[in-house]
Amino acid sequence: MADLSLPPDSLFLGFDSSTQSMKATVLDSNLNIIKTELVHFDSDLPQYKTKDGVYRDTTVNGRIVSPTLMWVEAFDLILQKLSNANFDFAKVIAVSGSGQQHGSVYWSKGSSEVLRSLDSKRSLKEQLENAFSVKESPIWMDSSTTLQCKEIENAVGGAMELSKITGSRAYERFTGPQIRKLFMTQGEVYKSTERISLVSSFMASLLVGDYACIDETDAAGMNLMDIEKRCWSKAALEATATGLEEKLGKLAPAYATAGSISQYFVQRFGFEKNCVVVQWSGDNPNSLAGLTLSTPGDLAISLGTSDTVFGITKELQPSLEGHVLPNPVDPESYMVMLVYKNASLTREEIRDRCAEGSWDVFNKYLQQTQPLNNGKLGFYYTENEILPPLPVGSHRYILENFSGESLEGVKEQEVGEFDPPSEVRALIEGQFLSKRAHTERFGMPSPPLRIIATGGASANENILSLISAIFGCDVYTVQRPDSASLGAALRAAHGWLCNKKGSFVPISNLYEGKLETTSLNCKLKVKAGDANIASTYGLLMKKRMEIENKLVEKLGHF
């Protein structure tokens, strides 16, 4: 094992370019966090006038974008913050990162030359102002490409066929439909685009000073890659746009090296020239790595701007909901993923409206209301939802004759409003009943062996208690809620090790036998409660899914 150890005194730097912020996490050779940094887009870069890191276009239904240059300037700023704190970049031997999934960046012709000849005396932002053919990047919250989704699915033989090829049916936020929209509506702009990157490969390109490959895991969120063969799918490419393969470049495994760090960073910040840049990947795959999720039967729930449920499987099973991606740290398995758009921002909206803008009041309401909420069920969508595919709106129901023992004779009555405490519980119960129902439908284990919760809301023990009650299992948390940038730093160490050995090394070799002494250790937060409660929640879940299916039939936007 000696040749698989990390050099003492070496550091591993992980970034997370997410929807609302950019984070940096530094791990030492014992895999302990020694430094973190944060740039919050709205407050640290107010000149871009974003709200929650995005622009919501009121003139085009569902169009949600972020200014590409803001991400560049955020990178300038986070590196400057590390430098101002006297961080020793020379000790960093590998860098990797995480990008919000599906978002795309469009480089104009000649930009590769600009990347290769960056002047270390000037900021990245100054030098890349004219590098993009599209100034505003479509992101995962965008739902303006329903037409393109249908066109792509029809071209390959239907939704299930596309899911078999790429791991997912067509989703509006996926990169393929977004590229098709550009191709169909702004053909000249598409033609003038030299390279199309994902947020992850875009950030890696800045670091290596040239176009970086898209990694195979993040590529599975594009509706363009053959998930079994790990190469671009000819059928999917042809269904999307002409001349696309050339604009996408090559694919690479997530654990591969993208290249050595560019001279720009060596001269400007003092990185060592041999520092390797490991392929960046998506935020959820990085969270999977950061949570050391490696056992089929474990589930992770990431609670952030989006909520995501993910797990691991050895089998490739296509489905019409959810997604299958290559596991970023194990070429022999897959990660399965369900994504919900109405997450922390929806929780905050109800906190502000019903709980005096206070989490303390919100939590008090959760504590003083009964499990099952006396049969009150709510559906709350402040954005067009992905799963289920429902438009903005709220729907509230009271179940009549619900004893908790069976659904016989139980009818739902739609109502206009709930009292504030019931509204708070209906939101949280509803969000997690929905997650349990969809994970079961997707073939994930029920009950799970355990759930690992991460993301901002995982710090809320009242929410964790409800998750435990609804799913009927123990709930663990990690020491820090920012598992994506932690996972990126861990993947930097893993990629460095694979590069040193010249072949794939299991990531568990990094922490086997010493997980408890690292920043990766999970802690038990809530023990599984009464199995009868979980079983009664199962009944409530079935009723909720009946109502959900009716809503989708009546209102479904896809």
UniProtKB/Swiss-Prot annotation:
**Which organism is this protein's natural source?**
Arabidopsis thaliana
- Which top-rank group of organisms is this from? Eukaryota
Q: Which GO terms describe its biological process?
A: carotenoid biosynthetic process; D-xylose metabolic process; xylulose metabolic process
Using the UniProt record, give the first listed, main subcellular location: cytoplasm
Family, similarity comment = Belongs to the FGGY kinase family.
Task: Give the regulation of activity.
Answer: Repressed by oxo-clomazone (keto-clomazone), a bleaching herbicide.
Relate the protein's function as given in its record.
Answer: Mediates 1-deoxy-D-xylulose (DX) phosphorylation in the cytoplasm prior to the translocation of 1-deoxy-D-xylulose 5-phosphate into plastids. Can also phosphorylate D-xylulose (Xyl). Uses preferentially ATP as cosubstrate.
Where is substrate annotated to bind? D16, Q20, S21, M22, K23, S111, D283
Phenotype reported upon loss of the gene: Impaired xylulose kinase activity in cytoplasm. Hypersensitivity to D-xylulose (Xyl) leading to reduced seeds germination. Loss of remediation of photosynthetic pigments after oxo-clomazone-mediated bleaching, thus leading to albino plants.
Q: Looking at the UniProt record for this protein, which Gene Ontology cellular component terms does it annotate, in alphabetical order?
A: cytosol; plastid
Provide the cofactor list for this protein: a divalent metal cation
Where in or outside the cell it occurs: the entry states: Cytoplasm
Q: State the CDD domains in the record.
A: ASKHA_NBD_FGGY_SpXK-like
Instruction: Recall the GO molecular function terms of this protein's record.
Output: ATP binding; D-xylulokinase activity
Q: Quick check: keyword Transmembrane helix in the entry?
A: no
Q: What is the lineage of its organism?
A: Eukaryota, Viridiplantae, Streptophyta, Embryophyta, Tracheophyta
Temperature-activity profile: Optimum temperature is 40 degrees Celsius (at pH 8). Active from 10 to 50 degrees Celsius.
Q: Record's InterPro entries?
A: ATPase_NBD, Carb_kinase_FGGY, D-XK_euk, FGGY_C, FGGY_N
In the UniProt record, does the keyword Nucleotide-binding occur? yes
What is an example of a Pfam family matching this protein? FGGY_C
Positions contributing to ATP binding: T305, G456, A457, S458, A459, N460
Reaction equation(s) it catalyzes: D-xylulose + ATP = D-xylulose 5-phosphate + ADP + H(+)
The encoding gene: XK2
Name the pathway it acts in: Isoprenoid biosynthesis; carotenoid biosynthesis
Protein name, entry field: Xylulose kinase 2
